[in-house]
Every structure is written in C-alpha cells, then in structure tokens.
C-alpha cells in the first residue's frame, strides 16, 4: 500500500504548448534528435517510432511533466557548470533521454529495451539516477528547493554496510 502521494508540479510551458506537455516534449526531442544527426533517411522511421512510443508511455503513466522537470534541472545544472553523470541505471534505455542530451547512450544502437525503464504496467515511478559531484549536489538541493518549495520535496538516502 502506498503511504504517500507524489505530486508532480505543473511546469510553465510556452503558451503554444500550455495544454499539451507531451507535444512540447516531442518537439524538444525531435529538435535534439535532428541536432544529434539521428534522423537520417535510413533510420528516420525507426527513431520516430521509438520516440513516439516512449512519449506515449510517459503520457499514459502521467510522467511527462516529471520528465520535463528532470530535463530542466539537468539543463540548469549544466549551464551553471556543474558536472553530472546520468548514464547509470535502466533509464539509459530511453531514447527520449538520449535525444534530450541527458544520457550519452543511443539505446537503438545498443538494442536496449525501453520497457526495462518504464512500461504501463509498472506500479512505481521510474528511477532516474543522476550523479552530481560532491560540491554540486548541495546546489541541486538548493535549486529544487527554490524551484518547488522546501515543503514540496524530500530527501531519501540509502545506507549500506559491509
């Protein structure tokens, strides 16, 4: 039984996309896919089909704005000169994350299954592992607190012993 409810904040989107975050996400993904040189005549259909599939799953699961928040956060951190690594974990199997410059692994090239990251039958939110340098992680906390309010976020930590 879930003892908590996750509230994904509504993001300020360009007016043209205010009522359709998924269309905004798709535009960003397509623009970046073209920028990465992925939409060549030989593989355009394969990449567009995978992009549309992933975005449809994000939309069905209600995670489009969550993903847009992750994109905004990583972009802000990158612009501020902070180092981060986002290639660990199953979300590296997402072409959307690759197109949005969050990961550097082309899941089609390496035949990675998106459904390992997210599928409509999954009960839990997807686990997005992003590692920040030690000094930067506090800047990330500060950014998120300022953006969404201290009362709207929580910190989770796992301790391991040997």
Predicted stretch roles:
Residues 1-162:
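Phosphodiester-processing cores and adjacent nucleic acid-binding clamps
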């Amino acid at each position: 039984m879930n003892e908590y409810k996750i509230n994904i904040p509504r993001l300020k989107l360009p007016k043209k996309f205010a009522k359709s975050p998924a269309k905004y996400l798709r535009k960003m993904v397509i623009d970046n896919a073209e920028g990465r040189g992925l939409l060549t005549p030989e593989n355009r259909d394969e990449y567009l089909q995978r992009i549309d599939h992933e975005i449809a799953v994000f939309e069905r699961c209600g995670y489009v704005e969550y993903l847009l928040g992750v994109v905004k956060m990583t972009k802000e951190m990158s612009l501020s000169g902070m180092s981060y690594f986002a290639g660990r974990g199953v979300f590296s199997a997402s072409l959307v994350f690759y197109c949005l410059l969050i990961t550097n692994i082309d899941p089609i090239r390496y035949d990675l299954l998106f459904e390992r990251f997210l599928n409509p039958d999954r009960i839990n939110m997807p686990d997005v592992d992003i590692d920040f340098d030690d000094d930067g992680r506090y800047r990330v906390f500060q950014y998120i607190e300022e953006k969404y309010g201290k009362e709207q976020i929580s910190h989770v930590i796992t301790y391991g012993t040997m």
